[in-house]
Amino acid sequence: MGIEQKAGDMGIVTASLEQLVNWSRSSAMWPLLFGLACCAIEMMGAQGANYDLSRFGMEINRASPRQADLMIVAGRVSRKMAPVVRRLYDQMADPKWVIAMGDCAACGGVFNNYAIVQGVDEIVPVDVYVAGCPPRPEALIDGIIHLHEKVKRMRLDGELREPVRLS
């Protein structure tokens, strides 16, 4: 009989250190917003009173990558902007996660030319893709929930990054 059964309904919570750390990481993500096109407008809408991202622990958007652990890339990335995205990603502290918001961030969208990166995953590893042109705030929130679930499944020594595709 384990401690969980012995404690019963005494108000004692048992958890591993790994579960506690992952709960903290998923409950207090600090986003660095990288809005490059029309998806940024929907990203701003997700932070309004109707959707309230603060209930997911994202009250404050970080202006410095050194204070952020989540980068949300919203919109198309040009070849000239690619080194900036990479530099900001490299300046973020580990562990760090990336959400590619919108079709342009995921695959270049309708801009199939030499000046546009065909997916931000060519520059940085992406954890969650949020589809849409532009995706609604509900889709971004769904992507954030998927990322929280992924973070809660991580080991303390890390895991292989597998992107989650949303329909």
Swiss-Prot record:
GO function term, MF aspect, one: 4 iron, 4 sulfur cluster binding
Record-listed [4Fe-4S] cluster binding positions: C38, C39, C104, C133
Cofactor field: [4Fe-4S] cluster
Annotated keywords: 4Fe-4S, Cell membrane, Iron, Iron-sulfur, Membrane, Metal-binding, NAD, Quinone, Translocase, Transport, Ubiquinone
Statement: the UniProt record of this protein carries the keyword Phosphoprotein: no
Cofactor: how bound: Binds 1 [4Fe-4S] cluster.
A Pfam family of this chain: Oxidored_q6
One GO CC annotation: plasma membrane
Keyword Protein biosynthesis: no
Catalytic activity: a quinone + NADH + 5 H(+)(in) = a quinol + NAD(+) + 4 H(+)(out)
EC number: 7.1.1.-
GO BP annotations, alphabetical order: aerobic respiration; electron transport coupled proton transport
Main location (coarse class): membrane
Membrane protein topology class: Peripheral membrane protein
Subcellular location: Cell membrane
SUBUNIT field: NDH-1 is composed of 14 different subunits. Subunits NuoB, C, D, E, F, and G constitute the peripheral sector of the complex.
HAMAP family in UniProt: NDH1_NuoB (MF_01356)
Cited NCBIfam families: nuoB_fam (TIGR01957), PRK06411.1 (NF005012)
Function: NDH-1 shuttles electrons from NADH, via FMN and iron-sulfur (Fe-S) centers, to quinones in the respiratory chain. The immediate electron acceptor for the enzyme in this species is believed to be ubiquinone. Couples the redox reaction to proton translocation (for every two electrons transferred, four hydrogen ions are translocated across the cytoplasmic membrane), and thus conserves the redox energy in a proton gradient.
Protein family (similarity comment): Belongs to the complex I 20 kDa subunit family.
Listed name of the protein: NADH-quinone oxidoreductase subunit B 2
Name of encoding gene: nuoB2
